[in-house]
């Protein structure tokens, strides 16, 4: 059998490592819309973790994350951004996979430290980078947050109101990496790997127990919050308004502000005719601040339809940072403070 610390492994193991890495990417892709197999996110990383640390040679270990990111983010981001934003965003998933191949070099560290930091590094590294890109990297921002795959599961996501989506992301990654370490420990015991190269089974059992408790506490809290919701709460009909123009407003020279307002007004009246009381617009629906332009027209529309309107817009002004914001317009004509998606 091959030595885990050498750069050579049998061809069969290498191929299996590649296939398992691709499997992880496929599971992650299926966990997100439009497929919506949300439960796959809770163990999707496990095949790639096993491939990275037990099947692929050390020098090519980063091929595992590169492959699952390619299979997952390649089609996911291409579908999200389409061709409108240019080839950079269309093929962004490919670029991320290439960068990952050169960045995921932690295998040597985990071998030298007996894998005692595997779970901590996996969870903190992943969620920490999510925080960084959400705060400092526009456009990409929160795209493909692992917790978003759970959006349809009301029974599971209620603690997000307490711990934010990052809390949910941490629990999902903790489950994945704990299961991954469990598979590594099982494999080491089965193969009889030397203690210096093997995962500590005692540490793994402790992590399995701790992760089980965290998951139990999360689910129990979620069910408790959901169960405490009012049984006779009023039902409010909400409409999502999309203008369906091919370009964002700051790039669109055909559909002017007036055209966009008129289209929105027509769709708003149509939605109200179907019983909507709250209207949401998609990101960057308008290219003007509703508190500064078309203000009276929008106020009259809100009063006429007796609806609450969440108005999203993007403003580009020379010498100023781009504003990507949303304001709430109430039926009485009052505007809320702007919510800044770009954290300005």
Where are these regions (language model features)?
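Membrane-embedded alpha-helical bundles of multi-pass enzymes
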Residues: 3-225, 278
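Soluble catalytic regions of membrane-associated enzymes that act on cell-envelope
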Residues: 224-344
């Amino acid at each position: 059998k091959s030595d885990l610390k050498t750069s050579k492994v049998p061809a069969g193991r290498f191929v299996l490592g590649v296939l398992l890495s691709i499997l992880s990417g496929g599971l992650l892709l299926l966990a997100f819309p439009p497929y919506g197999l949300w439960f796959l996110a809770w163990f999707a990383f496990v095949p790639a973790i096993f491939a990275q640390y037990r099947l692929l040679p050390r020098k090519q270990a980063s091929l595992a994350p590169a492959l699952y990111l390619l299979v997952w983010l390649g089609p996911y981001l291409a579908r999200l951004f389409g061709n409108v934003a240019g080839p950079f965003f269309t093929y962004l998933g490919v670029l991320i996979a290439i960068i990952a191949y050169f960045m995921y070099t932690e295998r040597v560290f985990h071998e030298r430290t007996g894998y005692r930091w595997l779970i901590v590094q996996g969870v903190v590294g992943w969620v920490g980078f999510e925080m960084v890109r959400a705060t400092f990297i526009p456009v990409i921002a929160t795209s493909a947050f692992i917790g978003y795959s759970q959006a349809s599961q009301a029974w599971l996501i209620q603690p997000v109101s307490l711990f934010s989506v990052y809390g949910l992301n941490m629990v999902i990654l903790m489950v994945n990496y704990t299961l991954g370490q469990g598979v590594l420990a099982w494999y080491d015991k089965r193969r009889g790997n030397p203690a210096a190269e093997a995962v500590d089974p005692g540490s793994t059992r402790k992590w399995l127990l701790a992760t089980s408790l965290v998951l139990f506490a999360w689910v129990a809290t979620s069910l408790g919050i959901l169960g405490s919701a009012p049984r006779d709460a009023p039902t409010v009909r909400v409409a999502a308004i999309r203008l369906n123009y091919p370009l964002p407003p700051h790039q669109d020279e055909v559909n002017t502000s007036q055209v966009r307002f008129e289209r929105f007004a027509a769709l708003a009246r149509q939605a109200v005719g179907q019983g909507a009381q709250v209207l949401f617009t998609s990101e960057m629906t308008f290219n003007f601040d509703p508190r500064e332009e078309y203000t009276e027209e929008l106020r009259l529309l809100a009063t006429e339809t007796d609806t609450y309107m969440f108005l999203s817009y993007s403003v580009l002004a020379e010498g100023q940072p781009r504003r990507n914001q949303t304001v709430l317009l109430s039926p009485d004509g009052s505007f809320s403070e702007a919510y800044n998606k770009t954290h300005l």
